Amino acid sequence: MANIIGLIIGIIIAIPGTIMPVRKFLSLRAEKIFFSLTLIPIALFYIGFSYYYGDLSALHAEIVGLIIFTVLALLAQFMASWILVVAYVAHAAWDVLHEVYVASIGGVIPWTEVPAGYAAFCLAYDLIIAAYVYKRMRLWDEAG
């Protein structure tokens, strides 16, 4: 049930909660900047979860994830918009890995525990945003 609720909330936050107001109030250039920079706080949530659940053994993996998504966000902003599509799809995979491998992968990489339904929420949000970015990237690139 938590996953169904997570999916529904992810859809609501993505479409009427993010895409619609961003599209209405931001220019094409600002829209691209917004979606690029949004990757950074999204990745920060996992560091917060590490502290919240008191399992700092996963902190190194989460910091690496934060660095990767920050680099992807900056590359997308300054190089090619398609990188942003890849980044959001990769983040969806990152979310699913946290749900599936919450204990560890082969005992080598610890993963941060996440709230019930969070991976479903993020999967819906990230994939909807990735599809939207894909749809808009040509316009963004033409706008500069």
Which residues are covered by each model-predicted region?
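Membrane-interface helix caps and helix-loop-helix hairpins in membrane proteins
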Residues: 25-30, 49-59, 78-79, 112
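Hydrophobic, membrane-inserted alpha-helices
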Residues: 42-47, 64-72
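Cytoplasmic-side transmembrane-helix entry/capping segments in multi-pass membrane proteins
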Residues: 29-39, 60-65, 84-90
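C-terminal membrane-adjacent module
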Residues: 98-144
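Structural signature of hydrophobic alpha-helical transmembrane segments
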Residues: 1-13, 57-64, 120
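Membrane-helix boundary elements
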Residues: 37-53
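N-terminal signal-anchor/start-transfer transmembrane helix
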Residues: 7-26, 133
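Hydrophobic alpha-helical membrane segments
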Residues: 85-103
